[in-house]
């Protein structure tokens, strides 16, 4: 009986990686993905290569904000720098910055810098009109050029060693002549220090022609004398500035403090200004002289996030969304029934606003669990739509960046991409890892995000938007990013330096890097006998490379190392071994491009 010939099965399998992916911390890994990376880039995809070099732009003492508008803007402590020059003072701390026309606006300081006029100033303004100095007509408000006022010192003072039997006249009233500054004291009664009480008015060891003291306390001392605590008042000549120095026609100002003419309190729009006279709409005031101290204010809301869209500054405060008057970041309360008016709307969703940004023809206001989308071109046309979607994580308001009409941001569960519909989670490869306090920027192609991990360590990741690859560059803690003239800048929160990305290695020198490939188990049961494994890499002159292997969860052991002063292509053999699974870790310093990884194996028994 003739039987057919059977071909002997060698059981050999061959697999190769010629396309390397990014990091993948999840269970769903694929050939070419990395369990960990450091100092790597996808710039030479499909190969693995090192990140570009970095160079120092400038050193700062305590920088907290970076912004680009024609030149770099930096907040260093309390200094606001534009193009390397200090142009104004702000409070220390984090900032939200946006630009409208030629004005760079800064919150929470409510300040601005005009790049054209080189003026640094305040968006808000206040103008006190002291008691008896403000005069109203039916449509005007005026103050005199000069007037003596009763000015109280801010800090209390004391006088010590006052004899218990000293006779001091205590008055019940004091007034200042507005024209001459002369003091008139009324209701005088002689008292001794033990009898003085809070609120008594005295003139003790002061210039009685223009000063008096309001008693705060009178206390017996150990030597039998008394110490009198007081607040000093002085008749001071006050010169009122022209209203043009603080206000402009069209400003909405809040008038408060009117007691004699209480009807005049409220918000009104200035129609014209002439020196120390403001003109408003007809017949809105009660005419007369106001006895109270009047405060005139151009108010600006305390916005916690801001952006610019369609020539308005948008922002959020509490549950309210605000928009400035058209082209005017100083006015948020102008309601004149015009298309140029300010705008405000309260929303009823839970939680605080966590960020806002202009996107396409809309403005997006984010919370952690929703987004409010505002459509329209002017206040009467504005409509707000609310969508329950994953929003921006609290503390990650600076993670917003737009690349090719896609908005990227950090949410609670990871990094999302938004294109107008439902946001898409693009960080599934992070698995169960969670990150916080993200700050991000872009070079126009890649999304750079610096964030804190579960144990508080900072990590800088880069997402290649063209290839959907995540790589960890290093442990940089970036306080802010800015993109200017083709270069991405960031503030290093640890060193206080402003750094430039995408540079050569002239300043940094050869950089260290590490790539740990995800575990190889060939997705089959049984121990595998590897007959051949090798890597192919191109190395620049002076670079070095080390290869290590870990089998069945054991420690890494070195299997190859090379260093050469000349550029070369190397083929790295890895000694065959029988195991269920293994990992490969590559590390080095200098330019080294990993091109492929080939392995041949046969599957044996499970033991």
Pin down the residues of each PLM region:
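Beta-sheet repeat architectures centered on beta-propellers
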Residues: 1-70, 391-395, 402-406, 413, ...
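Blade-loop segments of beta-propeller domains
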Residues: 62-63, 77, 82-101
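Short beta-strand elements that form the blades of beta-propeller/WD-repeat-like
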Residues: 70-76, 103-107, 312-317, 354-356, ...
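Structural motif
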Residues: 78-81, 112-118, 319-330, 369-375, ...
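Hydrophobic or amphipathic alpha-helical targeting/insertion segments
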Residues: 96-133
């Amino acid at each position: 009986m003739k039987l057919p010939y059977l071909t002997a099965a060698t059981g050999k399998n061959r697999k190769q990686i010629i396309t390397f992916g990014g990091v993948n911390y999840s269970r769903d890994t694929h050939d070419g993905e990395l369990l960990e990376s450091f100092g790597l880039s996808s710039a030479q995809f499909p190969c693995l290569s090192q990140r570009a070099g970095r160079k120092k732009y400038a050193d700062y003492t305590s920088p907290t904000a970076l912004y680009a508008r024609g030149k770099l803007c930096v907040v260093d402590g309390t200094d606001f720098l534009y193009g390397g020059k200090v142009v104004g003072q702000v409070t220390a701390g984090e900032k939200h910055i946006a630009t409208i026309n030629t004005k760079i606006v800064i919150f929470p300081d409510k300040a601005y810098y005009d790049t054209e006029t080189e003026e640094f100033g305040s968006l808000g303004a206040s103008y006190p009109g002291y008691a008896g100095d403000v005069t109203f007509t039916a449509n005007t408000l005026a103050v005199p050029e000069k007037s003596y006022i009763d000015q109280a010192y801010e800090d209390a003072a004391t006088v010590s060693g006052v004899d218990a039997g000293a006779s001091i006249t205590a008055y019940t009233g004091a007034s200042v002549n507005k024209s001459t500054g002369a003091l008139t004291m009324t209701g005088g009664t002689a008292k001794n220090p033990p009898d003085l009480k809070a609120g008594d008015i005295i003139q003790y060891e002061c210039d009685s022609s223009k000063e008096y003291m309001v008693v705060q306390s009178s206390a017996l001392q150990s030597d039998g004398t008394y110490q009198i605590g007081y607040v000093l008042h002085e008749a001071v000549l006050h010169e009122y500035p022209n209203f043009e120095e603080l206000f402009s026609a069209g400003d909405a100002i809040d008038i408060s403090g009117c007691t004699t003419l209480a009807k005049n309190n409220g918000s009104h729009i200035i129609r014209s200004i002439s020196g120390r006279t403001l003109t408003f709409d007809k017949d809105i005031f009660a005419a007369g002289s106001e006895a109270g101290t009047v405060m005139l204010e151009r108010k600006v809301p305390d916005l916690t996030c801001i952006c610019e869209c369609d020539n308005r500054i948008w922002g959020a405060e509490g549950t309210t969304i605000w928009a400035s008057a058209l082209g005017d970041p100083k006015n948020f309360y102008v309601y004149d029934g015009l298309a140029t008016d300010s705008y405000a709307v309260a929303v009823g969703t839970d939680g605080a606003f966590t960020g806002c940004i202009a996107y396409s023809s809309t403005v997006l206001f984010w919370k952690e669990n929703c987004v409010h989308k505002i459509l329209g071109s002017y206040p009467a046309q504005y409509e707000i739509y609310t969508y329950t979607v994953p929003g921006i994580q609290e503390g990650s308001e600076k993670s917003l960046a737009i690349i090719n009409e896609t908005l990227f941001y950090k949410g609670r569960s990871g990094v999302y991409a938004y294109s107008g519909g439902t946001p898409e989670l693009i960080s599934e490869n992070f698995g169960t890892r969670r990150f916080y306090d993200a700050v991000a920027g872009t070079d126009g192609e890649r999304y750079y995000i610096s964030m804190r991990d579960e144990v508080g360590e900072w990590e800088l990741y880069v997402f290649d938007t063209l290839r959907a690859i995540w790589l960890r560059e290093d442990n940089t803690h970036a306080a802010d990013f800015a993109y200017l003239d083709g270069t991405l800048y960031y503030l290093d929160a640890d060193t206080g330096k402003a750094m430039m990305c995408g540079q050569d290695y002239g300043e940094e020198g050869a950089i260290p890097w590490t790539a740990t490939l995800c575990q190889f188990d060939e997705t089959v049961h049984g121990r595998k006998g590897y007959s051949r494994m090798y890597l192919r890499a191109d190395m620049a002159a002076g670079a070095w490379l080390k290869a290590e292997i870990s089998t069945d969860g054991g420690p890494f052991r070195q299997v190859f190392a090379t260093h050469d002063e000349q550029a070369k292509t190397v083929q790295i053999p890895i000694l065959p071994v029988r195991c269920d699974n293994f990992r490969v870790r590559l590390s080095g310093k200098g330019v080294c491009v990993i091109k492929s990884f080939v392995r041949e194996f046969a599957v044996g028994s499970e033991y």
